Amino acid sequence: MNLLNLPKIELHCHLDGSLRVETAIELAKKEGVKLDSYEYDKVKELLVIPKECNSLEDYLNRFALPVKLLQRAENLERVAFELMEDASKENVKYIEIRFAPLLHLEKGMTQKEVIESVIKGIRKAEELYDIKGNLILSCLRHHSIDSVYEVIEEGKNFIGKGVVAIDLAGGELEGFVKPYEEVMKLARESGFRVTIHAGETGYGKNVRDAIELLGAERIGHGLFIFNDEEAYNLVKEKGVTLEMCPKSNIDTKGVNKYEDHPIYKYHKDNIRVNLSTDNRTVSNINLTEEFENVHKTFNIDFEDYKKIYLNSVEASFCSEELKEKLKLSIII
């Protein structure tokens, strides 16, 4: 299989974890952000996961610089465009980019301006490249519940205009789900589709709760459903798609190596999986490389690839019309 040339669907990709190093250097200089060095390798060290990373919390520290740099509309528009451009060059046909609007208000932008600027970057790339994109609005679990209401209130105006879903992200604690039940009900009623980061750091029950209490249609990671039989069966029976990011899980010590990752076992047991990068820069990987690693480790064949692709199309939050077009890309 020529994995680079095959069409791909990316459903789990964070904007602020996927900046080009060159762009970070340019923006740091432009914004007057003081760094010890502006040399490529030194700046890359600030953005890419260190070898001694021990946890998800360590991993999340790589977002400090990108958030500082993305406080102006033109910067957000640029990095959204560049992420789309990078993805298009490896035949990603559709991508759902996620980010937290409330992290980008430090220099006076409104949430509306923040969301508009990212959508603008996506649309500009769509005009130039064979790729389509939509936006998922992430809310951070260490912020207040009120902040989720704020995101829903502003974001609902963009449903069908570039925004498709809402997400809960950040550090994961056992039993985090219950307090979000009411606000996620409002999100669904407001037109948001729902994907939730859960089961990334050892708590399979969080996945079950995210589906049953929050109405999650997809789960970000879902790695640890193997340690909760009810969660495992629920994901399988309901056809909930797991957005799986093996390199990221290795980086955060969810698993130690590709051989230990359950993605192939889940796939073979007819659990729907999507393969994504999570954070292209932080994890220092693109989607083709991620597929190559999974291919080498588990010897997946074209039928496996095709099934993952078509499951990913079905799980996407794009229009039915676009889904039909995307399906045609893999019919050989």
UniProtKB/Swiss-Prot annotation:
EC number(s) on file: 3.5.4.4
Disulfide-bond pairs as recorded: none
Catalysed reactions, semicolon-separated: adenosine + H2O + H(+) = inosine + NH4(+); 2'-deoxyadenosine + H2O + H(+) = 2'-deoxyinosine + NH4(+)
Alphabetized UniProt keyword annotations: Hydrolase, Metal-binding, Nucleotide metabolism, Zinc
Coiled coil start-end: none
InterPro entries documented for this protein: A_deaminase, A_deaminase_dom, Ado/ade_deaminase, Metal_Hydrolase
Broad EC category: hydrolase
Active site: E200 (proton donor)
Site note Important for catalytic activity, residues: H221
GO BP terms: adenosine catabolic process; hypoxanthine salvage; inosine biosynthetic process; nucleotide metabolic process; purine ribonucleoside monophosphate biosynthetic process
Binding site for substrate: H14, D16, G170
Named cofactor requirement(s): Zn(2+)
Assigned GO CC terms: cytosol
GO molecular function: 2'-deoxyadenosine deaminase activity; adenosine deaminase activity; zinc ion binding
The record's free-text note on cofactor binding: Binds 1 zinc ion per subunit.
Record NCBIfam families: aden_deam (TIGR01430)
Protein family according to the UniProt entry: Belongs to the metallo-dependent hydrolases superfamily. Adenosine and AMP deaminases family. Adenosine deaminase subfamily.
Its biological purpose: Catalyzes the hydrolytic deamination of adenosine and 2-deoxyadenosine.
Record-linked HAMAP family: A_deaminase
Name of the featured protein: Adenosine deaminase
Organism, as annotated: Clostridium perfringens (strain 13 / Type A)
Gene of this entry: add
